[in-house]
Amino acid sequence: KADTIASRTAKYITESMDTDPAFFKKFSKMLEETIEEYRLGRISEAEYLQRAEEIMNKVLSHTDSEIPESLQNNNAGRAYFGLGLEVYKRVCKDAENFDLTELALLTANKIDEIIKAYIYPDNALMVDWTAKDRLIGAMKLDIEDYLIDVIKRKYGVPLTFDDMDSIVDSSVDVASKWFR
């Protein structure tokens, strides 16, 4: 039974990865580790079943204790949060000077605001916005400006241009999945 749950959960994660990459990567890794621990005999079959069910329930309900309450009803915002947090955790190894969750929340809210300003010009979703290269280019520049001016300069987070491109490109990709 645990193998079936794990297999179905893994399939669901693979199918949903584009909508919230950081979230699904995290749970994919947890699932892989659980399967490996069972295969190596480190956990019992009962523990394997319990963990597989726990992971499945969190994946299906899209819940994670790291996600701030204010983003619980904003799917795209949760994805932006995860993308930012993933990068900030990597670049701020000595995170004593930063509240990474707060920075990721600020980033998610700003990215959400910028993207919605472009794709909802008259409070209605722009048709085929994902095919408008100029719009996407301007949107990406605004997000990058925010990351440079606020996250890098104001808060001193040591982001490289590759880090920023990762956040920007992934955020726009996520938006294209949630706002059609």
Residue positions per predicted region:
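Catalytic cores and motor modules of nucleic-acid processing enzymes
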Residues: 1-180
